[in-house]
């Protein structure tokens, strides 16, 4: 990766919860591991291009998750959102496909790096925890952070 892109990646993860909770050293290390991909309108991710890859963070653009069976909408994401966590430990076929609704720049955090952060950082671990009550608590912490940022504290 071009080292001149690192400040942009660092800035992005510094404003993307839960990665905003990492210390400076963790953010530096994480930024160096992120892969950058670009996708055009109408492109799709599915199966081996989605399952088992990592966490996809949308830098710019809009995507939809669509059920493979009937094409129905599962979710819609835009800049600052993440997707792919439910597919991170899968191999082969994915549960859904991702369709790009416009040209999109993705930051991809490899699954081994995300697993390391989940294990080593409480905020990241809580955010991606399988237990609903822990995830909800993490979301509450995120809401508090956003409110504090809006107030300028």
Task: Tell what function each PLM region has.
Residues 103-114:
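A short hydrophobic beta-strand segment most commonly corresponding to one strand
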Residues 4-5, 10, 85, 91-92, ...:
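Short leucine-rich amphipathic alpha-helices used at interfaces
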Residues 1-7, 11, 17-25:
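A short, N-terminal "cap"/entry segment at the start of jelly-roll beta-barrel domains
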Residues 20-41:
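Short proline/glycine- and basic residue-enriched helix-capping loop/turn segments at helix->loop/beta transitions
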Residues 18, 43-103, 129, 133-135:
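Cyclic nucleotide-binding regulatory domains
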Residues 37-39, 77, 109:
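Hydrophobic residues at beta-strand termini and immediately following loops
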């Amino acid at each position: 990766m071009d080292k001149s892109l690192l400040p942009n990646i660092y800035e992005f993860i510094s404003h993307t919860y839960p990665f905003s909770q990492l210390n400076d050293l963790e953010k530096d290390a994480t930024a160096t591991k992120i892969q950058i991909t670009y996708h055009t309108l109408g492109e799709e991710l599915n199966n081996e291009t989605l399952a088992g890859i990592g966490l996809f963070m949308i830098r710019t653009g809009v995507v939809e998750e669509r059920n493979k069976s009937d094409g129905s909408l599962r979710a819609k994401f835009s800049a600052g959102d993440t997707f792919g966590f439910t597919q991170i430990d899968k191999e082969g076929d994915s549960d859904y496909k991702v369709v790009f609704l416009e040209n999109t720049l993705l930051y991809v955090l490899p699954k081994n790096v995300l697993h390391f952060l989940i294990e080593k950082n409480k905020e990241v671990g809580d955010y991606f925890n399988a237990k609903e009550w822990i995830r909800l608590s993490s979301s509450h912490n995120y809401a508090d952070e956003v409110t504090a940022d809006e107030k300028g504290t």
